[in-house]
Amino acid sequence: MKKVLALLLALSMLAGCSSNPAEDEKNNAEIPSAPQVSAPVEKPAETPAAPVEEEPSYPVIEAAAFDGTSLAPAEDGTLRVAYPADLYTPAPDFSPLTLWLNETIDAEQSANINIQKSEAFPETLNQELLDEMLAAQKTVEGAEALTINVAEVRELNSEPVFYLENVTQINDAVIDLMIAEGVLTEEMIEQAGGREVFKAIPPTKSVAIYGIVDGYLTMYTGTYYDDAHKQTLIDTMTILFANTEFLS
């Protein structure tokens, strides 16, 4: 636009220029004046409109509906969710809030979902932020125990979310991290039989959805040992995402 305005200003200055005025009068006396014909005025070229940036398009996670299953509340003092009551049982006095999948609740390793409220997050989730998160994850102590097989930005309920699939092998660094984050305590480890019991757990598969709920980054992580339970966990997390409220 600035270049167009400068060009129009230069043309108006040139239109006011003339040859020697005395010579013009002489020529006008010798030559009859010709009829004045206005020169056609050229319309300034229009500046092409700037291209409109399109919103990025992400693969969609379809929100599930468990027909015939009622939703029940569960909370941990920080947040409350509504979950499919026929399929899950809340873990009592456990932080973060955890739901056990009923069909595996008596198994040695039970499939479950935990929900955590993280920090206030004013930004929209996007690929750049996901890349930054993945890069930061590599610097965490015990990072070698986590293998990330899928890390994508997807769309859930018309909102961008992070979708991840991981495999974790528990080692001492992971146990230390779980203690630091309040997931485990030394007392819990001792009651279970010591660290070796945890390190003997087979590689743990997980699928996670990170989304923004009421301005906070909220993490839904499903843990499973049998691939047959994976889709059930994903479907449940879509329901939890739409039915989460914060208590503090």
What are these regions (language model features)?
Residues L79, P160, Y216-T218:
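Hydrophobic residues embedded in beta-strands of well-ordered beta-sheets
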Residues M1-V4, L8:
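Positively charged n-region of N-terminal signal peptides that target proteins for export
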Residues A6, S18-I105, T221-S248:
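N-terminal targeting sequences that direct proteins away from the cytosol to non-cytosolic compartments
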Residues L14-G16:
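C-terminal motif of bacterial Sec signal peptides marking the signal peptidase cleavage site
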Residues L134-I209:
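Signature of long, low-cysteine stretches enriched in small and polar/charged residues
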